[in-house]
């Protein structure tokens, strides 16, 4: 503990002496600090990559071991449930339930059906009157055609 305090006191005095010298020390210090920061960042990134690679290898070995045990005892691999199915089980959820892909597809089909039914008349009595008038219109148009054309 005493060594730490002594270093702090001497270090502070050393910094004050450097500050009296001018900004030259600070420029070199800034360049060195930037280089050190870049080197430290690179070392951290490399360490993280090594850690991830090590973890991946260990996980592969574990999976191989699990597979040998499954084969030995005739067990089947557990299939993970989809996150959507797990989300449905959340009872304490504050927001509304998100729609599944199937529900979205069903809604799209309903909209298409609505578009097709929009072509038909909405009033059934209107449709029946048009159907009942149809034979009379056909007879009238056939009569007009026969008057215009005479068979010889």
From Swiss-Prot:
Membrane-topology annotation of the record: Lipid-anchor
Presence of keyword rRNA-binding: no
Pfam families: Synaphin
Keywords, comma-separated and alphabetical: Cytoplasm, Exocytosis, Lipoprotein, Membrane, Methylation, Neurotransmitter transport, Prenylation, Transport
Comp. bias intervals (Basic and acidic residues): 41-82, 90-104
Primary location: membrane
GO cellular component: cytosol; SNARE complex; terminal bouton
Stretches with biased composition (Acidic residues): 23-39
GO MF term list: syntaxin binding
SUBUNIT field: Binds to the SNARE core complex containing SNAP25, synaptobrevin and syntaxin-1.
Family named by the database record: Belongs to the complexin/synaphin family.
Function in brief: Positively regulates a late step in synaptic vesicle exocytosis.
Descriptive protein name: Complexin
Originating species: Doryteuthis pealeii (Longfin inshore squid)
